[in-house]
């Protein structure tokens, strides 16, 4: 079984005060970093942003709001469709405000991607690799 999972989706980006517009989102899961999903947003062949997000939070965000920091997820019911809203917050401004952008993805597509990642590394079976790291560090000293 492949240790990498890729999925490309057309998603909707909405920056502060703008209408939604389509961009590509490339989702990647690598079993070598089992807790993370890398998401690359691109438009007109240009990378707009690259984020590494927690796989567990991504899954939880399909059913309930999660996150309190720079990245937050929440489900959105948009008529007959279910979406996942990924919200990204920038650094604070002098006035206390923050830049904010939201990305809306079909929840079913994200759920399908996560099922593929779970086939590679099941939830709860992830290993942080701390013991291996410490062994390497101690062997070098």
Q: Model regions: which residues?
A:
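Coil-to-beta-strand transition motifs
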Residues: 32-35, 81, 96
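Mixed-charge, glycine-accented linear interaction segment located at domain edges/termini
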Residues: 97-141
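Short, internal acidic amphipathic alpha-helical interface segments
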Residues: 49-94
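Short, surface-exposed beta-strand/loop "edge" segments at domain boundaries and coil↔beta transitions
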Residues: 18-20, 43-52, 93-101
């Amino acid at each position: 079984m492949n240790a990498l999972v890729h999925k490309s989706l057309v998603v909707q980006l909405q920056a502060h005060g703008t209408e939604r517009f389509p961009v590509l989102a490339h989702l990647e899961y690598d079993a070598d970093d089992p807790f993370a999903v890398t998401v690359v947003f691109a438009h007109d062949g240009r990378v707009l942003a690259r984020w590494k997000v927690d796989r567990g939070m991504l899954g939880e965000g399909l059913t309930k709001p999660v996150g309190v920091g720079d990245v937050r997820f929440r489900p959105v019911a948009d008529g007959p469709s279910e979406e996942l809203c990924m919200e990204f917050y920038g650094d604070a401004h002098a006035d206390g405000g923050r830049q904010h952008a939201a990305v809306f993805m079909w929840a079913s597509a994200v759920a399908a991607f996560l099922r593929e990642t779970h086939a590679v590394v099941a939830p709860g079976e992830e290993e942080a690799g701390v013991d291996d790291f410490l062994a390497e560090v101690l062997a070098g000293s």
